[in-house]
């Protein structure tokens, strides 16, 4: 009996082993069939719009190695074949010839719309930041999400839930190793470069509008809608000082890149300069008649200028030596929302407004190299014309402007729930200024959207149809159904145009 049972067990085990082999053979055959079908399918080439700065950067390095960098840089001829002569932004900034700097208005302003990026679940975008190496763009939305886009091909890379409430501010440290974010509920978070969250601070009782690092990254500054600013120790996350002096929401703050000086702009229409060591206000700048929305120190050049914009439709440039405004720009039709200095050209700024417009200004013709006005007879409110205007850059208010670290790209984002990329236009490109961003003609307009697909933006037809008048129905054209009868055709001899009954 024992032997019989063992034989039965062996036979059952052999059957199970054979069944497993058959199943494995079937699955392998199935996988091979799928691979053959996929291999037999014709693969379509995917075209992707790319902004590649490697060519002109390499050409510039070759010129520098040959000693050509110190020679005058002429204007590019208005032909597409001369695109090879377009150099990177640092080339025009480093050239010592004064008249070449003025050529910047033609060769080095971000006027060409390149790409539109938006998430599937769309939310208003409050702030954006390029990663320190410039390869990616970090977008922070009202939903508390981080979205990362490729900085050259503009395709989607990743998304993560970073905060529980709307993210209002982002700031990278000067050593490029840390990222700070602040949200609507007053929470501050520390992030490593791989977006690993290592620390959380309950910093304010209201939304954190702006964050700035000290020059040595040992401290950072936050401003909030609770009308206060705070200086924090970065290493232990402890509050060191509280700067109290504004009587309303503090909308913007910045720490000078070299000096021990802090600037803040508030809803009380005042700009205040602070000593971070004494927690005291050293000066108050007047002149604005409405909320100050953004204040930024000059990051390059002499670093003696301060740019600020307000909801009174003006932008003011202050000289830190005299504590007075040396330029007042009133070129927008609506309130201004943000301002950004160019990272390479010290005299170039970009402003954005709540109506979605964006202007570029080059102040070389108004301010000389030593930041003293060229014409002392003109007052500071003399009219200044924009070097370039983009009247319909966004459909709604622009909340953020951010230049690429190399200066050849600009990203703008706002309440229309999209981030848009701008580059320098090609020489004599007829399509650079003929799209909907300049003409506002959105009927049949297109944008390069997510993954470089063309997203049609079609406005509803304004033609009215009278239901009581049958003849008005001929104005309605259904796609793919052209030249169909609409029921109003003439019926001569009682037959009309019925197929097969001609000549009656």
From Swiss-Prot:
InterPro entries: G-protein_beta_WD-40_rep (IPR020472), Pfs2-like (IPR045245), WD40/YVTN_repeat-like_dom_sf (IPR015943), WD40_repeat_dom_sf (IPR036322), WD40_rpt (IPR001680)
Keywords assigned by UniProt, alphabetized: Chromosome partition, mRNA processing, Nucleus, Repeat, WD repeat
GO BP field: chromosome segregation; co-transcriptional mRNA 3'-end processing, cleavage and polyadenylation pathway
Biased amino acid composition, Low complexity: 1-22, 477-488
GO cellular component: chromatin; mRNA cleavage and polyadenylation specificity factor complex
Start-end of Polar residues biased regions: 463-475
Disordered as annotated region, ranges: 1-27, 463-504
Cellular compartments annotated: Nucleus
Chief subcellular location: nucleus
Mapped WD repeat ranges: 120-159, 162-201, 203-242, 245-284, 287-328, 331-373, 393-432
Any Pfam family matching the protein: WD40
Record's function text: Required for 3'-end cleavage and polyadenylation of pre-mRNAs. Also involved in chromosome segregation where it has a role in chromosome attachment to the mitotic spindle.
Name of this chain's protein: Polyadenylation factor subunit 2
